[in-house]
Amino acid sequence: MQHLPAPIHHARDAAQLPVAIDYPAALALRQMSMVHDELPKYLLAPEVSALLHYVPDLRRKMLLATLWNTGARINEALALTRGDFSLTPPYPFVQLATLKQRTEKAARTAGRTPAGQQTHRLVPLSDSWYVSQLQTMVATLKIPMERRNKRTGRTEKARIWEVTDRTVRTWIGEAVAAAAADGVTFSVPVTPHTFRHSYAMHMLYAGIPLKVLQSLMGHKSISSTEVY
């Protein structure tokens, strides 16, 4: 990312996971990794904060902040309901069902979970700003716990974000364009999955063991985590 204008430096409405990082070293490491196209492309915390600054709508901002604070795949984030969150201090967390597990579960008629397969993972929510803003969004937008399915007539758990992957990509594109208008650019293309890669790298910078990160990311194989 290029230099940030003064308003970004002083903005406090953008989320940063509370971890101290040697940013000059982190920038140098990322510059080296960009030589290899096959390695994950990610943003550093100040860049994520800058991007969120250009998302004025609280509902949109909190979806992107959820991707950043949890490392969720976009399908996982869009499936979240209020019941998946426990925001009670001192240890708030979110329960995520991994993408592949959700797909397999929908395809099984017997509803049995394959032996040894964990269907959900718990991800701690360490950013108090994020937790507070999520509570504000739920209260302000009056997001219900359940709603009636107009097609089936059944009462179902209400998803927090009733949008599609394409819509989220549009939101991100609009934020990137707004940032560019202020002279703020990003070193990598930004997609929903960029936030997942960014979360993983941020956790590694914080000293999280690889096996723990594997669990947080919902990787079945450690080899998937080792790409970071």
Question: What kind of region is each of these model predictions?
Answer:
Residues 126-186:
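Active-site/catalytic core of tyrosine-dependent DNA strand-transfer enzymes
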Residues 79-136:
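Conserved tyrosine-mediated DNA breakage-rejoining catalytic core shared by Y-recombinases
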Residues 20-49, 104-128:
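DNA breakage-rejoining catalytic core of tyrosine-based enzymes
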